[in-house]
Structures are given as structure tokens and as C-alpha cells.
A protein has these predicted regions:
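A generic structural signal for secondary-structure junctions
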Residues: 46-47, 78, 117
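Non-transmembrane alpha-helical segments in soluble domains
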Residues: 15-19, 71, 109, 113
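Generic hydrophobic alpha-helical segments
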Residues: 18-21, 80, 91, 119
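Short glycine/threonine-rich loop-to-helix capping motif typified by GTGT followed
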Residues: 43, 98-99
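Generic C-terminal helix-cap and adjacent flexible tail
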Residues: 114-120
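Catalytic loop of short-chain dehydrogenase/reductase
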Residues: 1-27, 33-56
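C-terminal helical subdomain
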Residues: 7, 31, 54-94, 100-106, ...
Length: 120
């Protein structure tokens, strides 16, 4: 789970930096938490976590419900000029303090570009 959590943090940081770089272009970049969606994620976990994954699915939302914020961000005129934000249930929400660190966002961007063999 630690790797999964870090990947989600990186998604938020990368989006913040992308939004900063696109500022003034008319292109927006936002990220979101879809909620706990009933998917097959974790089905192959095995060990002690398998019963927890199975049990948790009773509290999950449908994929259609989980997609609502994605559709909202892609189509609503209410957020047409909103950028660099983190949304949950179609509402801008403050992510963790680590996810608001602009220096970390820049460093992640630079490291990603270097790993991809791209210039800044």
C-alpha cells in the first residue's frame, strides 16, 4: 500500500506542476479522488489483506458513481477555468500538506523529465 499511496501523491504533485506550467494558456489540469470504487483492484493481493479487500467492497461505490467527478471536471462550465485543484465528490478539496508542496512538485517534474529523456 505504501507504493500505491506514493503514486497517488505523485499524481497530485505532477498535476500541480502541470497546472503551473500551463497557466495562462487556457488549458487546465486538475486531479481528483473518485472515492472508494468497486473495482477488481486488490483481488489478487493474497495473504491477510484478501479478506479485508473482500469485506471493503460492500462499502464501495459503483464505477459510474466514481466517474461523476471525472465527467464533471471534463464537461462543466463551472470549472472551465479552474486549474491545479484537487477534487472529491465534485468539490475542490485540500489535499494533504505533502501534496501541496510546490518544491516537491517541481522536483518530481524535473526527475520525471530526466527519466523520460526529455528537456525541461
Amino acid at each position: 500500500m505504501k507504493a500505491y499511496s506514493r503514486s497517488k501523491l505523485c499524481n497530485i504533485l505532477f498535476t500541480r506542476e502541470l497546472a503551473r506550467r500551463l497557466h495562462g494558456t487556457g488549458i487546465t489540469a486538475n486531479c481528483l479522488h473518485p472515492g472508494f470504487v468497486a473495482t477488481r483492484f486488490g483481488d489478487q493481493s493474497g495473504g491477510l489483506i484478501s479478506p479485508l479487500v473482500w469485506l471493503a467492497k460492500f462499502f464501495a461505490i459503483s464505477p459510474a458513481k466514481g466517474a461523476e467527478t471525472i465527467v464533471y471536471l471534463a464537461s462543466s462550465p463551472d470549472v472551465a477555468e479552474t486549474t491545479g485543484q484537487y477534487f472529491y465528490k465534485s468539490v475542490p478539496t485540500m489535499p494533504s500538506s505533502r501534496a501541496q508542496d510546490d518544491r516537491s512538485a517541481l522536483l518530481l517534474w524535473q526527475r520525471s523529465a530526466a527519466l523520460a529523456g526529455m528537456k525541461e
